[in-house]
């Protein structure tokens, strides 16, 4: 049976795991790392890079390097958070055909789902390389506080990457699964998850294989990227004070500042001070300029204090919704790379009144939990029951623009709820159902998920027709809505597709595009491998020719030299097939040389053996003993 993989599709880094017996195992990528940067680059040569290779070239190609795209997924172009991001990233964020935020590279538009799919493809290939078989099914994690549009867009990304997404699971819930799988005693835990781009807090009751989420809260635009950007701003401001040059308009300099900020942030988790040293950051008429400064942990903490404090309000809300006090939490589990920051650990300790649990790897635990959920769905992991919740209230717009909730936040999913509404005007023959998600009292202040019309209502005074609206949330947290006129039995049912979102045709086109790219990538990889093999063969043949050329005939030597020359010429082109053919030719004509080498080494071995035998002969003096003389 094919394996189901678990993928943590992160803002900054992604991770893939699989069940290995009874345990979840994190899989190393082709670079030997257990996490992969969530970075995609488009080079001037038309090449597409994903992961570490993409991140490495970001400084020289800032506009062609896309990072933190998870912050755009499922968001409209006019979203205030997107506006904020546009000012901070060096790549182009543009308006998609459907009104969503997309990115543009070399004149081509890509949806965030497409970019995410490229990262998912890399994780899929990583798993396939380790398992030695094709992988087609996955469990993918999302922040608990993701809305329906963001969940749907993540599921679309999986489909574009060629994966059947069996389940979308919340990141804190996945972390709790990995943390609590072997724990039999009942516990109430809080999972504090501060990653690269999002913050989640979930309160769960776990014990004896049951994982029940009591409440969840968070902020989908708060994470390590914000901490980095705060430092970038500080570095740029200090440099401007000193040199009078604004680096914020220089995309190349900004990319170098971002890398320096990330490095400084990590170093300050284990040391009190770090030095930022960026030579030749810019230049003016007087010559090149260098950026050098010291940054203390205390200064860094003061710069980001408001960001750290922003995590506390969601914690309070989650506890309130769960009906608990901070002191009633048995264990606080830290998840996400940002929780390595001492200030965050201190704030968590102060709020919950206990030391946070540090026994899980914050970068890997979410992927491990996703793999466990994959095992549960496949039937390999027994006696585990996961009860998650919907993070935001769902409802429709009613008379006066009021938001009428049908499903309250933190309701256990899957769930279904119906309510009967009526018409607002006499003889109204159609109603428009506008579906919203959020916590504000007026519908317009919440996130519009979709709208549809129920038509053909028979003429009647207002308030008489009975229209039953039913919400159905599946285990992925994705919404389906139907409206039915109880008088006529007419029904309209839709699977929510965000007011932007990708249509089935869009997804199909992107799947084809991804498959073509996969074929191109494979072809390119095969070309590189063939080139490497050819160069290695040329090197070894030339070396052998120097050493044993006198052991073959002049004609044979000429054939070998001609084959080497042909292969070198083929390497100057880009035809992989020609390189392979010329390699085979060289291998064939070199057989006589190989034979000569073998015979030569055999002869040398025989000579050595003879010498060894001669060395073993010991000259001895014998004394004749006459037995008779006794």
Curated annotation (Swiss-Prot):
Induction: By stress conditions e.g. heat shock. Keywords: ATP-binding, Chaperone, Nucleotide-binding, Phosphoprotein, Stress response. One of its GO terms (molecular function) is unfolded protein binding. The keyword Phosphoprotein applies. The modification Phosphothreonine is found at residue 198. Residues 608-624 have a biased composition (Acidic residues). PROSITE patterns: HSP70_1, HSP70_2, HSP70_3. SUPFAM superfamilies: Actin-like ATPase domain (SSF53067), Heat shock protein 70kD (HSP70), C-terminal subdomain (SSF100934), Heat shock protein 70kD (HSP70), peptide-binding domain (SSF100920). InterPro entries: ATPase_NBD, Chaperone_DnaK, Heat_shock_70_CS, HSP70_C_sf, HSP70_peptide-bd_sf, Hsp_70_fam. Belongs to the heat shock protein 70 family. This is Chaperone protein DnaK. It comes from Bartonella tribocorum (strain CIP 105476 / IBS 506).
